[in-house]
């Protein structure tokens, strides 16, 4: 429940959240460290176990995967996507983004200051 004394502030944001699935923890960690090291994102949260059910090349797959939640700016999406495609083991890696509309202003500022310009 939201406290009636609290106000919700919508701030303009160029921050996006990118979802990237990986086949295992080692690859997820490697991708995350590369993206942070190259300043393509400010932070990657790794969710160690997700179950993905999908159809690929005519077959239904049921796989355990690791999910990366990448915090970056919309300006870096294309460069980040190209880097992930280059280093990812999947033929067709999941790289999808959603825009952050609401957020902690200090966190949004931190993301912008942390990634490359």
Curated annotation (Swiss-Prot):
InterPro entries assigned to the protein according to its UniProt record, in alphabetical order: Ion_tolerance_CutA, N-reg_PII-like_a/b, N-reg_PII/ATP_PRibTrfase_C
Pfam families: CutA1 (PF03091)
SUPFAM superfamilies: GlnB-like (SSF54913)
Name of the protein in question: Divalent-cation tolerance protein cutA homolog
PANTHER family (UniProt xref): DIVALENT CATION TOLERANCE CUTA-RELATED (PTHR23419), FI09726P (PTHR23419:SF8)
GO biological process: response to metal ion
One function term, GO molecular function aspect: copper ion binding
Gene3D superfamilies listed in its UniProt record: 3.30.70.120
Subunit structure, as described in the record: Homotrimer.
Family assignment from sequence similarity: Belongs to the CutA family.
């Amino acid at each position: 429940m939201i406290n009636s004394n609290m106000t919700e502030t919508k701030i303009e944001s160029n921050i996006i959240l990118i979802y990237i699935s990986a086949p295992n923890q080692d690859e997820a960690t490697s991708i995350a460290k590369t993206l942070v090291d190259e300043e393509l994102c400010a932070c990657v949260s790794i969710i160690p176990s997700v179950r993905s059910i999908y159809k690929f090349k005519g077959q239904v797959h049921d796989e355990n995967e690791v999910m990366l939640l990448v915090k970056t700016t919309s300006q870096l999406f294309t460069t980040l996507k190209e880097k992930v495609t280059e280093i990812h083991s999947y033929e067709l890696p999941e790289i999808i983004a959603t825009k952050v509309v609401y957020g902690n202003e200090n966190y949004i500022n931190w993301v912008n200051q942390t990634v490359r310009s």
